Structures are given as structure tokens and as C-alpha cells.
Amino acid sequence: MTNIRKTHPLFKIINDSLIDLPTPSSISSWWNFGSLLAVCLGIQILTGLFLAMHYTSDTATAFQSVTHICRDVNYGWLLRYMHANGASMFVICLFLHVGRGLYYGSYIYTETWNVGILLLFAVMATAFMGYVLPWGQMSFWGATVITNLLSAIPYIGTNLVEWIWGGFSVDKATLTRFFAFHFLLPFIIAALVMVHLLFLHETGSNNPTGIPSDADMIPFHPYHTIKDMLGALTMFLVLLMLVLFSPDLLGDPDNYIPANPLNTPPHIKPEWYFLFAYAILRSIPNKLGGVLALVLSILILALMPLLHTSKQRSMMFRPLSQCLFWLLVADLLTLTWIGGQPVEHPFIIIGQLASILYFSLVLVLMPLISIVENRLLKW
């Protein structure tokens, strides 16, 4: 008798995606982050759903409803901090996943890569809107500053900002629509994940060598399912440590002060994972220029397949490219640090230099060094 998982129309799809999927035998733990992101998305949707049952998206009661969740709802504090710190874990996994793609040349699968960029933007938009919902000081002023950036768009900018706000400032209408979109977007993300996987399974996974591995495949289950479960367990442990021992480590103390439009905090800054882009935005004195640099800092990923000049796909055997890759990582960490600092000397000049280095590395130095490596190998 034929196994039901291979004949049933629905089970067959699951089987071909998660059980009998031929997978390169050489893929390392850097390939774990895709499944970890799926786990993160699951955690976020579940905790978010239960939080939405108790949250009210009204400026008069939003802050109070979050307090009520933490104090009066059974395990509400756990839900709230799992959701807040789960977002941080989500973005850490996302950055590592993108970094893996850059290092091993996974961007050569352009469809999968482009859907991934769409996912990155969707997650960033969701995280930003989620940050506004507790309606603390940083929520309110963060929303004001970031949405105001759209006013830099010529001609339609001001109208666009007021249309997003639903009035002449960030107010009740803004909070309500941000809650609606924050609730909706994770489901759109889940649909995009399916598209991402659909494109990935058309080509099969890349591997650390960057060499086609059709001759050396193993089934996804049990080999990689066990590996993914270990990764998920490790991540869950880190998340629980964060939630139970220092839940506010990655948050902003200003967000425990209710939103007050009449009192501006001394340093307005977004969540820690947006600080690198915020630093690039601040390093350009012109408003429109800053906004363009901010968008390009992420959109530059879409150019990666075009900027690939090496004859080898992966950086595994390219030591010069590896040096530049890790310089890029160090540069992003520097930008993250600068984004959290006040706008004063010497932070301004460090931010400007780090921003120039970021774009130079990706657009100029890395493609050039790849050509040099080709020459050294007489290719």
C-alpha cells in the first residue's frame, strides 16, 4: 500500500517540502535560520493574538491596557515580554539569515532573494507599527519622526503624511490604523513565506561551497529536522533567559512614560535593530537625501545579484572577499552604536564615515576585490 503522505493531495505538498525534500548534505548551521524565522513568526502571531484580546487601540486607554495586561491578565507579563523580545529574536535571525545569503552567494537565486527583500521590508514595517502601540513617549515620538520622513517626498509629501496620520498630527486615528495594520501584516508575511519557499524549492538549497550538490543529497527528515529542532530549542532558551531575567534590556525606559505631545524626549530613537539605518539617515544633512539613503541602505540588497563579479558563488574560498564581508559586519555594528548616540561630535563624523564605508563596500570595493580574486586565480 502506498504511503498516504505521498498520495494525499495536501500531505504530498507537506511531504515534498519538509520530509522527503532532497537537501545538500553539506549545509551548516547557518542554514538553520530559515526554520528559526518560521518559529519566531509562529511565536509572534500566537502571543500577538492573545495580546490583541486585551489591548485597546485608543489614545486614552492604550497605555493603560498594556499596564492591565502586565498586571491583571494571567501570564500577561509573559505574553507581553515574549512578544516584545520575540521581535528582537526575529530580527536577529533575519539579519543572520540575510548575512548568510550574502556570504554564501544565495542571492544568485534572484526570485527567492527578491521575495526575501519584500519579507524584510514587511517585517520592518510590522515591527515599527508594533513599537507605536504601547503609546509611551518613544512610541509617540518615534511614530512622529519616522512618518514625518515621508514629507521629504517632493510635491505630495505633506499630503501623504497627513493621509497616513489621519489628521494633522499622530493621534487616535493613527494608533487605530497602526494596530489594524500591525495585526494584518504578519498574515501577509506568512503568505510571502510560502512564496519564498515555493521559489526556493524550484531551485533547491544552496550550500557552503556554492558548487551544485545534486550528486550529494539527503532527505530533509530526519537529518535536518533534528538539526532545526536543536536550533529552535537553543533560540527558545535564549529568548526565555531574556524574558525572565532582563525583559527590558532591549527596550527604551522612555516608553514607560505615557505619550505626551507637549514634552519631547531628549533623544528620540527607534528600536535597536533599526539604529543602523537611523544612523545612515542622520549622517546626511539634507532631509530628502537622508530618506533616500535610509531606503537604499536596505534596497541595496536587491542589487547584490548584479554586483556579483566573482567566478565563484560562495565566499568560502575567497579570503579577500571574506575580509571585506567582516568589515561590512563591523561597519553595521558601528552604525548601530552611532544610531543610539546623541547628535554631537565625535558621533556625527563617525556616523558619516561609517555610512560612506557601508555604501562603498557594497557598491565598489566588494565587486572590485572579486575581480582581483578572479585575476589571481587566472580566471
Curated annotation (Swiss-Prot):
<dbReference type="GO" id="GO:0045275">
    <property type="term" value="C:respiratory chain complex III"/>
</dbReference>
<protein>
    <recommendedName>
        <fullName>Cytochrome b</fullName>
    </recommendedName>
</protein>
<dbReference type="InterPro" id="IPR005797">
    <property type="entry name" value="Cyt_b/b6_N"/>
</dbReference>
<feature type="binding site" description="axial binding residue">
    <location>
        <position position="182"/>
    </location>
    <ligand>
        <name>heme b b562</name>
    </ligand>
</feature>
<comment type="subunit">
    <text>The cytochrome bc1 complex contains 11 subunits: 3 respiratory subunits (MT-CYB, CYC1 and UQCRFS1), 2 core proteins (UQCRC1 and UQCRC2) and 6 low-molecular weight proteins (UQCRH/QCR6, UQCRB/QCR7, UQCRQ/QCR8, UQCR10/QCR9, UQCR11/QCR10 and a cleavage product of UQCRFS1). This cytochrome bc1 complex then forms a dimer.</text>
</comment>
<dbReference type="InterPro" id="IPR005798">
    <property type="entry name" value="Cyt_b/b6_C"/>
</dbReference>
<dbReference type="Pfam" id="PF00033">
    <property type="entry name" value="Cytochrome_B"/>
</dbReference>
<keyword id="KW-0249">Electron transport</keyword>
<dbReference type="GO" id="GO:0046872">
    <property type="term" value="F:metal ion binding"/>
</dbReference>
<dbReference type="InterPro" id="IPR030689">
    <property type="entry name" value="Cytochrome_b"/>
</dbReference>
<feature type="transmembrane region" description="Helical">
    <location>
        <begin position="288"/>
        <end position="308"/>
    </location>
</feature>
<keyword id="KW-0813">Transport</keyword>
<keyword id="KW-0472">Membrane</keyword>
<dbReference type="InterPro" id="IPR027387">
    <property type="entry name" value="Cytb/b6-like_sf"/>
</dbReference>
<dbReference type="GO" id="GO:0008121">
    <property type="term" value="F:ubiquinol-cytochrome-c reductase activity"/>
</dbReference>
<dbReference type="InterPro" id="IPR048260">
    <property type="entry name" value="Cytochrome_b_C_euk/bac"/>
</dbReference>
<keyword id="KW-0349">Heme</keyword>
<comment type="function">
    <text>Component of the ubiquinol-cytochrome c reductase complex (complex III or cytochrome b-c1 complex) that is part of the mitochondrial respiratory chain. The b-c1 complex mediates electron transfer from ubiquinol to cytochrome c. Contributes to the generation of a proton gradient across the mitochondrial membrane that is then used for ATP synthesis.</text>
</comment>
<keyword id="KW-0496">Mitochondrion</keyword>
<dbReference type="InterPro" id="IPR036150">
    <property type="entry name" value="Cyt_b/b6_C_sf"/>
</dbReference>
<keyword id="KW-0830">Ubiquinone</keyword>
<feature type="transmembrane region" description="Helical">
    <location>
        <begin position="320"/>
        <end position="340"/>
    </location>
</feature>
<feature type="transmembrane region" description="Helical">
    <location>
        <begin position="77"/>
        <end position="98"/>
    </location>
</feature>
<feature type="transmembrane region" description="Helical">
    <location>
        <begin position="347"/>
        <end position="367"/>
    </location>
</feature>
<feature type="transmembrane region" description="Helical">
    <location>
        <begin position="226"/>
        <end position="246"/>
    </location>
</feature>
<comment type="similarity">
    <text>Belongs to the cytochrome b family.</text>
</comment>
<feature type="transmembrane region" description="Helical">
    <location>
        <begin position="178"/>
        <end position="198"/>
    </location>
</feature>
<dbReference type="InterPro" id="IPR016174">
    <property type="entry name" value="Di-haem_cyt_TM"/>
</dbReference>
<keyword id="KW-0479">Metal-binding</keyword>
<feature type="transmembrane region" description="Helical">
    <location>
        <begin position="113"/>
        <end position="133"/>
    </location>
</feature>
<feature type="binding site" description="axial binding residue">
    <location>
        <position position="196"/>
    </location>
    <ligand>
        <name>heme b b566</name>
    </ligand>
</feature>
<keyword id="KW-0999">Mitochondrion inner membrane</keyword>
<feature type="binding site" description="axial binding residue">
    <location>
        <position position="83"/>
    </location>
    <ligand>
        <name>heme b b562</name>
    </ligand>
</feature>
<keyword id="KW-0812">Transmembrane</keyword>
<feature type="binding site" description="axial binding residue">
    <location>
        <position position="97"/>
    </location>
    <ligand>
        <name>heme b b566</name>
    </ligand>
</feature>
<keyword id="KW-0679">Respiratory chain</keyword>
<feature type="binding site">
    <location>
        <position position="201"/>
    </location>
    <ligand>
        <name>a ubiquinone</name>
    </ligand>
</feature>
<keyword id="KW-1133">Transmembrane helix</keyword>
<feature type="transmembrane region" description="Helical">
    <location>
        <begin position="33"/>
        <end position="53"/>
    </location>
</feature>
<dbReference type="Pfam" id="PF00032">
    <property type="entry name" value="Cytochrom_B_C"/>
</dbReference>
<dbReference type="GO" id="GO:0005743">
    <property type="term" value="C:mitochondrial inner membrane"/>
</dbReference>
<dbReference type="GO" id="GO:0006122">
    <property type="term" value="P:mitochondrial electron transport, ubiquinol to cytochrome c"/>
</dbReference>
